[in-house]
Amino acid sequence: VDLSTPRRKRRLAAETNEAVMSTYVRQFLCLKDNYGVLVHDSATGATASIDAPDGEAVIAAADAAGWTLTDALVTHHHADHVQGLPALRARYPKLSVSAPAKEAARIGGVDRPLSEGDYARVGRLAAKVIETPGHTAGHIVYWFEEEEIAFVGDTLFALGCGRVFETPPAVMWGSLLKLASLPGSTEVYCGHEYTEANARFALTIEPDNAVLKARAGEIATLRAAGKPTLPTTIAAELATNPFLRAEEPTLQAAIGMPGADPAAAFAEIRGRKDRF
């Protein structure tokens, strides 16, 4: 899927002049249901791969766009997000790999270990690092604030969230709250195309959510046509994603937990999804 049109334009003020630059995002499916994503800064020519699920697919996408990869921004250590790194390093010897500091040893070959509040740079673009433990203990998200884009790996999915493998559910809930606090207009790119299955589950939690029902129909139409359901937005997820709505009274009533601690409600929903 080629989304390599300008996603956002911003102005950088210098002392005596202004430069207008565009950020380009190219998203493509690889492996079974992973998304590869390239971020390109046209002002400098810098290009980053968000994770590296399939090195050859990433290289092919970069070649098709006429871009040279300069960076890899890794969200977490799982194999389907890092197994392409050796191929990328072989093709691009000057590649700089950024990754969670807490998982750098496990990933290997990390040039820039990153923690909460650090910045990853792609040319003149700057992504603030948000630590989102839960799916893995060191998972991070890259938030390009000025471009209003977040690359969330496997922490948040459209209508879903990642399985909680390495922390208690309450920790994952805290991570989701961080993402929920981003501006509603933020475009969200996730690691997988899971949306249609997530919609089926979400409707078992909130069958009377009219916005969710309408969105599920739109998703079915997109997938039937072989089109992606991503990016999503924070606003869309707050309205329809049961995992972000665990503190909503209507959702808590729907799962039989009125007035519950939101972290407990989240854990209940996550457990139901694991068994779905």
Predicted regions and their residues:
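Short, Lys/Arg-enriched N-terminal segments with co-localized hydrophobic residues
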Residues: 7-20
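Conserved beta-strand hairpin/beta-sheet module of binuclear metal-dependent hydrolase folds
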Residues: 21-69, 141-153
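Core dinuclear metal-dependent hydrolase active-site scaffold
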Residues: 38, 119-145, 149, 181
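Divalent metal-coordination and catalytic microenvironments
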Residues: 39, 51, 76, 132-135, ...
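Active-site HxH/HxHxD metal-binding segment of metal-dependent hydrolases
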Residues: 47, 54-131, 148
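Active-site metal-binding loops of divalent metal-dependent hydrolases
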Residues: 52-53, 77, 102-103, 135-136, ...
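Active-site-adjacent loop/tail segments of enzyme domains
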Residues: 160-186
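Accessory terminal helices/loops
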Residues: 177-187, 196-276
